[in-house]
Amino acid sequence: MLLPRIPQLSHATRAAYVAAKSPFSPVPVRPFHASAALRAIDMAKVDTTHRLAELRKLMKERNVDIYMVPSEDSHQSEYIAPCDARRAYISGFTGSAGYAVITHEKAALSTDGRYFNQAEKQLDSNWELLKQGIQDVPTIQQWTADQAGGGKVVGVDPSVVTAGDARKLAEKIKKKGGEYKAIDENLVDLVWGSERPARPSEKVIVQPKKYAGKGFEDKIDDLRKELEKKKSLGFVVSMLDEVAWLFNLRGSDIPYNPVFFSYAVVTPTTATLYVDENKLPEDVKEHLGDKITIRPYEAIFGDVTALSKELFEANDKNETQKKFLTSNTASWALNKALGGDDKVEETRSPVGDSKAVKNEVELEGMRQCHIRDGAALSEYFAWLEDQLINKKATLDEVDGADKLEEIRKKHDMFMGLSFDTISSTGANAAVIHYKPEKGECATIDSKAIYLCDSGAQYRDGTTDTTRTLHFTEPTEMERKAYTLVLKGNMALERVKFPKGTTGFALDALARQFLWAEGLDYRHGTGHGVGSFLNVHEGPIGIGTRVQYSEVSLAVGNVVSDEPGYYEDGKFGIRIENMVMVKEVETKHKFGDKPYLGFEHVTMTPYCRNLVDMKLLTEDEKKFINDYHKEVYEKTSKYFDKDALTLEWLKRETAPY
């Protein structure tokens, strides 16, 4: 699953879930994804007149002239729970990216090009749509600052914006003569009232050491060593996947991501987990033992205020200047609770850095889950071809996505999807962030490109694979584009590079063959992936984002390799493999540096029908043949009683 080259606002999520019982834990756990029955988007306008009137009353009572409603939750999560979908509630717009700002006379909603059509359908007459990226249309920050002139107060819930973003916007507003102010109560929550969904309270499960590879005690010890190096008083863990990883726990509070609502505070002598205790079964409490203090989720702000005061007083007596560490994604509210910028040092999260370097157990888990997942994808593609070509079936894009999920569910340790499947036919495949919706999506066309970007959560790893197929006769341009993308995918996978190289530096390798033809794609080439955690994981990645120039790739990183090519209104192509960074042998070691390379773990054939053999070198053909041989050897055992898939797999993996 790709990340856009230009950073987008955080994704919102579906507003409902389906209860289910996981066979892999002793307690009921919801799936990590929205039900297929809930995929349809209601495009009807919501009358927001009353909601806005109530919000403006609250604004007036609190002397707020302008109120900002971002998409994010308190943890800057990519996906959010229904109770945190405040922007969707106040505006009626349910797209995954957007920012709402309300004044006493106006209301504006900013979103990007993926959602212009949806926003126009869903926003009522109370709202002005700011089309992000269109010439002469201001950003929501610029629009807000312009409205703040003349001493107006701009309010925001400080728990849903980062401290860094708050500083930047406060400066813009100040230059216009306004004031940016933290409003501790979330005013949209007050308007929402009793209709607001409850915060999820699903049970937490243990991620055993046989999957995690390392005990949580050792992880906390490693974090304390980092605190000692930085001479820090402690670290506040605010990202949900970081808390889950640090304590070897998983949850199901957020769709697609096996995390739970929580914070953690680690000091040189204490470790406290902030979570609703009723979410912790006895086995989880036994797992944590007496080394971890459990405190209520809501107690975090009061506790860090008291703790920071206590530690800073002791710090003053020692006449040493130490600060609390927070990640650069921590909220403004946490920053304020800890005493503000003078007492807080923002940094790239040391927990996030450690999490991105998988240990040998996690790496082996990634290998194994990708074999099972590859078998599921081959079964799906064989079934789909048979349905379309032999049975002349009529299937829409969601039918395909649902069938793939059904097949994945049969495999060991399946826990849910890792994101909503992108099942796209023809022109829809050219929409980079396409999401099929029942009742709105297209019928799969056997005479057109079919792009499937999908992934799953397993107890031993997280998968994300994209394959592009054609079931009949592709055009010459489709074959050429596919082969150029495939060449770029292979070039990146096969590169050897010195330790210290960044994903920013490697990005061009995947684009080189497209560039030679004057072609390109408008998204990043790769993103980090968690181990039974979030499918998008920082801080590493491959692309032109500034952050990818700041962090070098390291042994144990798992990252996607997914170049593509898209022609609007016609077709789209993307090929995505998951690769792991490993040390490699080279004849020389310039500067005595180790050299690194990639190991592929994705086990799904490329599409023979789309490969233009004339564009491949003999070396590239050998690479594909070796890969296909490995795919067949590792996945064919799943099809002893499935002649259809086995024949398809033999055909697709036959030597060139």
UniProtKB/Swiss-Prot annotation:
Entry GO MF terms: metal ion binding; metalloaminopeptidase activity
Keyword entries, A-Z: Aminopeptidase, Hydrolase, Manganese, Metal-binding, Metalloprotease, Protease
EC number annotated for this UniProt entry: 3.4.11.9
Function per UniProt: Catalyzes the removal of a penultimate prolyl residue from the N-termini of peptides.
Cofactor binding summary note: Binds 2 manganese ions per subunit.
GO BP term, example: proteolysis
Protein name: Probable Xaa-Pro aminopeptidase P
Positions of Mn(2+) 2 binding: 453, 464, 576
Domain of life: Eukaryota
Organism: Pyrenophora teres f. teres (strain 0-1) (Barley net blotch fungus)
Cofactor(s) listed in the protein's UniProt record: Mn(2+)
Enzyme class: hydrolase
PROSITE patterns attached to this UniProt entry: PROLINE_PEPTIDASE (PS00491)
